[in-house]
Amino acid sequence: MNFLFSKVKCWLLLLPGMLFACSAQSVKKESISLIEGSPAVFAVEESYQIFLRIRKPALVKIKVGRSVFSGHTNGIRPSGSKVHAFTVPGKLLDKVGLYEVICQELPERRPYMREVKRFPEKSFMYEFKALPAENVRIFHIADIHNRITQATATAAAAGKFDLLILNGDLVEHMASPSSLETALVLAGNMTGGRLPVICTRGNHELRGKFAENITQYMPNHQGKLYYQVKCGPLYAVVLDGGEDKSDSHPAYGNTIDCTSFRKEQLEYLRSSALREEFKVAQSKYKLVICHIPFPRYMGKSTADEEKRLFTVYGEWSKELKTFLKPHLIVSGHVHRKLIQHGPDFPAPVLMGAALDKKTDIVSGSMLTLAKGKINVDFIDHLGKKGSGERISNP
């Protein structure tokens, strides 16, 4: 879909349905009223995690081809949660190219459900586009700090893409339950539930009253926010740098233990199972995705505890450089649009998003994967494009 952005004001792009309007005529209004916005389809390991926001208490299930996924937890189908999540095999959804959301309103849940009025099931069909084998376009954005309108407009200005990366600091802090849904809102707005999304947590998502509940609203692998992604010609390792200062910093009030969390990820990178995955991935486009551009901090030393923080970033970098040999590290955090190279870096580091708090201009980046190379261009929500850089496979 092409947008003549210079001739259309930003708010016009944000009509109901956002960037993608469903064309299915068979969808009933009752079904639409149950589903808030569009689904978000996150790539995790070899699966997709489909997140839905439901306005009323309801039973929800996903159907892909002949396979049905109920989203049960230990045999119980949830009905009271606003957010419902389902894991479906990646190869299955890629092949079928279509999934059905089936909702059944359930206003009351009793020990014996025959006493409760039963509502009919209503369905909503979504097309899904798997990544192409070549010429993959990836739109990347981070550090929007609640500027949902501008971020959605930046995605529109970027034009057509095949995969979305939401790379942290999407909020200022987790102040309310709605803050937890920000990634789901953005993913739905920008893809309409039709494209895969990779999502990371930024340091600002660790802050606030509701920060501890984030895994209920965000893609994860067995509760962990670090994992690998196998999606078409792309292989990625998603890492989480946690907070950007030492655990003992007075701003955190002893509420975090990112030191242990980073060491846990180091052990993950050192695991023999993951190293075997790295060998298999050598024919793919290889990315490392992390909100904090960790290679640029390794080797720095200030206070003893912060020195340990920067040391573990160096260990991460060493493991990745030795065994994965990634083509690009994709990050945000610094609110700058640049690509940094370093002799000890595992790969060039893209800092591919920016927020100018004086003007509220939000910028992202477009990565094009083609013919063994990655091309990077920058764009803001006003449609202004910046020069990019081409990175060849090592």
Locations of regions flagged by a protein language model:
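Short, flexible/disordered intra-domain loops and linkers
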Residues: 177-180, 248-257, 298-312
